[in-house]
Amino acid sequence: MEINATTLWRDILAVRTKAPLVHNITNYVVMNSTANALLSIGASPVMAHAEEEVIDMVTIAGSLVINIGTLSKAWVAAMHKAMKKAHELQKPIVFDPVGAGATPYRTQTILELIHETPPSIIRGNSSEIKALVEAGIKTKGVDSTESSESAIEAAKHLSQKYGAVICISGATDHILNQEEYVRVENGHPMMTKVTGLGCTATAVVAAFAAINPSMMEATAHGMAAMGIAGEIAAKNVAGPGSLQVNFLDTLYSLSEADVHSHLKICA
Amino acid sequence: MEINATTLWRDILAVRTKAPLVHNITNYVVMNSTANALLSIGASPVMAHAEEEVIDMVTIAGSLVINIGTLSKAWVAAMHKAMKKAHELQKPIVFDPVGAGATPYRTQTILELIHETPPSIIRGNSSEIKALVEAGIKTKGVDSTESSESAIEAAKHLSQKYGAVICISGATDHILNQEEYVRVENGHPMMTKVTGLGCTATAVVAAFAAINPSMMEATAHGMAAMGIAGEIAAKNVAGPGSLQVNFLDTLYSLSEADVHSHLKICA
Amino acid sequence: MEINATTLWRDILAVRTKAPLVHNITNYVVMNSTANALLSIGASPVMAHAEEEVIDMVTIAGSLVINIGTLSKAWVAAMHKAMKKAHELQKPIVFDPVGAGATPYRTQTILELIHETPPSIIRGNSSEIKALVEAGIKTKGVDSTESSESAIEAAKHLSQKYGAVICISGATDHILNQEEYVRVENGHPMMTKVTGLGCTATAVVAAFAAINPSMMEATAHGMAAMGIAGEIAAKNVAGPGSLQVNFLDTLYSLSEADVHSHLKICA
C-alpha cells in the first residue's frame, strides 16, 4: 500500500483518462448530485435498478455502488442480484449503509445484503458503522452525532467479519482493513450542510476502485479527493448552496498543485 | 399566538440548536432541494418511504412531511401508516397537496389521506386548496394561476372540517385556523421559477412545527423564513439558477438583523 | 419548414406567453434539473407516473416526454398508457431512449414502446440511435463515445419506420425526417459534464412541440435554444457546477439579440 500526493494524482489522471463506468443503485435524494460528482471527477455514471437489467449493467461497469438511503422491496432484490454478479466478476462493490440503526428494517436489510455478498468497501459515518456491529444502537436519522474515532473498534470487527475495507467518514476519515490503517484529515465542516456528500464520497471511491485494484488505496484516494475538493471549494463561499456548486467545479479542475499542497494523510 | 420578528428569530435559533429530525415522504422532483433547504435552516432531514420502516422512522422524528407530488400506490400505503403513527404520537403532520385538482386520482388520494388522519397543517397554492373543497375545479398542472386571496373561503372550510391550520401560499401567504388569521407578505416573484420551492416551504414549516407547539406560529414562522430568504436571495441574481443557490446560502446565514429588517407580517 | 433566428425567437416568446404544460414521465436523476429548465424557458412542468393518473394528466398537457433513464415495470406500463392517450389526442410525444444498447432489457423495452405507439420525435445520442436499429451494438453506459454523424443512416431508417423526427445530439445536432434535414451547431463541450443535459434537451424540445405543430421546427428550435444557452452559459465558468447554474439563468433571460448573434443552424 502506497498512498501519497503522487499516487493520488496518478489515480486522478487514471480516472480522467479511463472514464470508468460506475453503476449506482442509490437513493433518490442524491442521484443527481452523485452523477454530477462522478462526471466532474472524470468517471461515467449510470443509475439502474430494474431487476431485469442490473446483471447486464454491472457486467459492463467498472464498479458497483450500493446505497440503501431510500429503501424498498423491489430495489433490495435488485441490489442482491447486482452484488452477486459483481462478486462473481470480481468487480469492486462499494457499500453505503445510509441511516443504519435508524430503523430495524434498514439495519436488517443491510446485514442481509452484506452477509450474502461481502462488499469490497463499506463507507459510513460513525453511527452507521457502529450500528452494523452493535444491535440496538441509537441513531438519529441519517446524520451522525458522534466522532468518527468512536467507531474504530466496530470498523475493525466489520473488516474482519466481511474481509472488506471500512471507511468511517467524519472530520477525520479512518480507513482500515485487517492489516492496514490510514487517516485522511481533509474536508470542511460546511460539507455536512450539503445533502448527500457522504453518498457522493462513496460513489467517488467507487470511481477510484474501478481503476486501482488496491481497495485501501482506492478508498484513501477517493476520500482524499473529496476532502481536498471540499476544502478548496469552501474558501470564501457564502453557504451550502455555493459550496455545492464550487465543489463540482473544484473536482473538475483539481490540479497536481492542489493535491500536493492540500493532502493531509497519515498512512 | 404571538408572531413577530422576535418570535421568528427565537424559533430560527431553536431550529439551529435542536436540529429536529424531519421525516419526509415526498416527491422525487424535490427530494434533493428539500433536504438541502432543511440542512441550511438547521434541521436534519430524512427521506424514507418503505412501508416496513415509516412507523419506526416517524417515531424518532420531530415532525412528518407528506407530499403527494409523484404519487403511486405503494407510497400512499406508507403515507397512511406514517400519518396514523404520527397522529398517535402527537407529532405534527404537515401536508402538501401538490397538484390537487389536476387529476381525479390525485384529488381523491389526498382526500382519503387527510380524511383518515387529519394533518396539523396543510400548505398549498390557491388552486390546490380550492380543489380540496370544490369538486371539479379546473387546475392546470402543479402551478397555480389564481391569486391566493381567492381561496380564503375554501381554506376556512378546510380548517373547520379537519381542525388544521391552512396556509395558502402565493404573492401573499394566508395562514388561518378556526379562530386566527395571519398574512405574510415576504417573497419574490422569481421564486415561482425554481421548481419545488412550494414543497420546500412545506418542509421548512415542518422544521418549525417540530420545535414550537403552536401550529399557527410554526406555519407563519416557516413561511416568513422562506419568504425573507427568497427576497434577500433574489437581489442581484441573473435568474432562477443563481436564485436557488443564493436561497440556500441565505437560509443558512439568516441573521437577526435580516429578520427584523425584512419581516412583513400582519397578525 | 422555416427555421432561423426569427422563427426561433418567435417560438421562445410563444413558450413564455403560453407556458405550455409539459407532462414528463422521466428518470429520477434528472427530474429536478429538467423541471427547472422547463420553468426557466417559460413552460410549466409536471412529473406524474402513476398508472391511475397518466391518462388524465396527458389530457390536460400540451405535450408528453417519455424518458426511460431509470426503468422499471410499473413505469413502463404507465408509459404505454400515456403514449396511447397522447397519440389519440394528437399531442406530441417526445421520446428519449436513454442508454439504449446498454442492456437488452432497455433496448427491448424501448422498441416495444415505440412500436406500439410511434413517438413524434426521438432524441438520443449516436450510440442510442444506432442501438435502436442495429441489434447488438456496443454501448458504454449512457454517455456516447461516437460522433453524431455516424448515426445518420440509422436515424433515416428510424424516421422511415416510425414516421418520427429523429434528433441525434452531439457536438453537432442532426435533425431529420423522411424529407427534411437540419443541422444545429450550437453548444459547448462542457455540457457533457453536467448530468442530464441530454434529457433536458428532450424536455425543452417538448415545450416547443407544444406550441408549434411542425415537429421539425420544434425540434430544431428546442435544440438551438439549448445549445445557445449552453454556449453563453459556458463563458467564463469554472466548471460543470457553475455551468448548470448559469445555464438556467441564461435560458431564463435569453434575448432576441442572443438568438440572432449565436444561432448556428444549417437548414
UniProtKB/Swiss-Prot annotation, chains A, B, C:
Q: Which domain of life is it from?
A: Bacteria
Cofactor(s) recorded for this entry are: Mg(2+)
UniProt entry keywords in alphabetical sequence: ATP-binding, Kinase, Magnesium, Metal-binding, Nucleotide-binding, Thiamine biosynthesis, Transferase
Q: Which GO terms label this protein's molecular function in UniProt? A: ATP binding; hydroxyethylthiazole kinase activity; magnesium ion binding
Q: In which pathway does it act?
A: Cofactor biosynthesis; thiamine diphosphate biosynthesis; 4-methyl-5-(2-phosphoethyl)-thiazole from 5-(2-hydroxyethyl)-4-methylthiazole: step 1/1
The record's section on Gene3D superfamilies has:
3.40.1190.20
Catalyzed reactions per annotation: 5-(2-hydroxyethyl)-4-methylthiazole + ATP = 4-methyl-5-(2-phosphooxyethyl)-thiazole + ADP + H(+)
One Pfam short name: HK
What SUPFAM superfamilies would the database entry show?
Answer: Ribokinase-like
The record's top EC class is transferase
Q: What is its EC number?
A: 2.7.1.50
Q: Please give the biological process terms from Gene Ontology that the record holds.
A: thiamine biosynthetic process; thiamine diphosphate biosynthetic process
Q: What job does this protein perform?
A: Catalyzes the phosphorylation of the hydroxyl group of 4-methyl-5-beta-hydroxyethylthiazole (THZ).
- Which protein family is named in the record? Belongs to the Thz kinase family.
Q: Which NCBIfam families match?
A: PRK09355.1, thiM
Q: What is this protein called?
A: Hydroxyethylthiazole kinase
Q: Which gene encodes it?
A: thiM
